[in-house]
């Protein structure tokens, strides 16, 4: 809802044509969208799973810009898991099906992860690359002159939103490989969001990592 006014002004749409993501499964919302007779839909880094009832409202399909290099890092926090799991990072423009980021790929582009990247800096790079990829791909989608490349259902990785909770709590008495701990901390560094932490005297103490290049000598 943060950019509601900007979206309304840019699209030239009346407020009644804007729907909250949390309402997309409600019958009254689905009926309102149906009356608009949409052809195709566009999802951009959207955090909600769209079910078949919603997908069927768009005869031309719904296309998604995902901040991950599919089939790697399907689902949530693709920027985080690309660093933590050392998987390829990138952006993918694909067709939405009933799975989680499992639809056929139209085009994609890798984004290099630098040693000083954090969850935030990588996300910003993915945003920038995603915009460029969309501008490049949309004309072919609009004219229906694009190829589809099915994903291998047995390859890649997937994560739920809650998966980051399993890595955020750092145990000060646990033995970590230095590289793994550094990757975890930098992946979860995204001010002003809370990320990795440890607990002391009943309180959570949050950690952020600052990285920069220096002289090799």
What is each of the regions a protein language model found here?
Residues 1-217:
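One-carbon transfer enzymes
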